[in-house]
Regions:
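Metal-dependent de-N-acetylase/amidase catalytic core
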Residues: 1-152
Length: 152
């Protein structure tokens, strides 16, 4: 398991993890590798929903500047991968509070007042309740995303 080629969102350490992991897998005789990614299309949709909620006065947790910054970052091609490229989608809503706590614990990566941590619980779960993966050895080619990382 390594990050996608862009490191999820262009993070240089994550890009290096991808390079080293893929190289190791190849040197070890072609060990299967899965890439952890973010669903660029799902994140963009979540931002669009937040913009609409903010405009209607519902998203009191967000502000216009924050939303515009998020939108700009999600438009970059090095941010995650397109839904059509993602081969696996695993529901993690059963552990969503632990996921949020883990993100919060990475203070060097995510500020306490970040867009992600400011979301209400329901919005956070809808946005981050799925973990996304790519099996680079098996392009999706229109198939439904699998929810089983080991067998499919």
């Amino acid at each position: 398991m390594v990050y996608d080629p862009s490191g999820g969102y262009g993070h240089p350490d994550h890009i290096q993890v991808h390079r080293v992991g893929v190289r190791w897998a190849s040197a070890a005789g072609g060990v299967p590798v899965r890439w952890v990614t973010m669903n660029r299309d799902a994140i963009r949709s979540a931002i669009d929903r937040a913009v609409d909620e903010f405009a209607s006065g519902e998203a009191t947790w967000a502000d216009e500047e924050m939303l515009e910054l998020r939108r700009q970052r999600a438009e970059v091609d090095t941010f995650g991968m397109a839904d059509a490229e993602i081969t696996h989608a695993v529901d993690v809503t059963a552990v969503i509070s632990r996921k949020r706590d883990a993100i919060r614990a990475h203070a060097s990566q995510v500020a306490a007042d970040s867009f992600f941590l400011a979301m209400p619980d329901e919005t956070f779960a809808a946005t981050f309740g799925t973990e996304w993966f790519v099996d680079p050895g098996r392009p999706r080619n229109g198939r439904t995303q699998s929810d089983d990382l080991l067998l499919a």
